[in-house]
UniProtKB/Swiss-Prot annotation:
This is Microfibrillar-associated protein 5. The keyword Acyltransferase does not apply. May play a role in hematopoiesis. In the cardiovascular system, could regulate growth factors or participate in cell signaling in maintaining large vessel integrity. Component of the elastin-associated microfibrils. A motif (Cell attachment site) lies at residues 30-32. It comes from Homo sapiens (Human). Residues 1-21 form the signal peptide. It is linked to Aortic aneurysm, familial thoracic 9: A disease characterized by permanent dilation of the thoracic aorta usually due to degenerative changes in the aortic wall. It is primarily associated with a characteristic histologic appearance known as 'medial necrosis' or 'Erdheim cystic medial necrosis' in which there is degeneration and fragmentation of elastic fibers, loss of smooth muscle cells, and an accumulation of basophilic ground substance. The gene is MFAP5.
Amino acid sequence: MSLLGPKVLLFLAAFIITSDWIPLGVNSQRGDDVTQATPETFTEDPNLVNDPATDETVLAVLADIAPSTDDLASLSEKNTTAECWDEKFTCTRLYSVHRPVKQCIHQLCFTSLRRMYIVNKEICSRLVCKEHEAMKDELCRQMAGLPPRRLRRSNYFRLPPCENVDLQRPNGL
């Protein structure tokens, strides 16, 4: 009998709370009055959220700050010594976001969070350096069970031949 107490209290709270009451921090909408939203921007990390208003204000503030010539010179020196280049690639991702939806049955309205999927189609760029590519190659070799390149050149570790060439040839007449 004591189990009915919380259910009855929740049911009464749903009738007592007016339909225009919205929990703090939740914007609601109905399906018939949805307007086209502005395209959203995303970061590399799907756990982070960009607020377009703050992004624009940050960009406006950063545009006022000009880097010093010493900073520009050190950046160009780093790029030339490390042999780095800017690589562009497509970074299409599928994001799952929760959007609030307000639903009303007669005069009883409630807000629920529905999961929606957003496809992000962007061209991303990253700074690639020759030394990082060499380290990636070395890690791939280690994960494949191959020796490091310097040990392979010194004949420290020999791999078995991949295939016997004589076995591949068909025996002719």
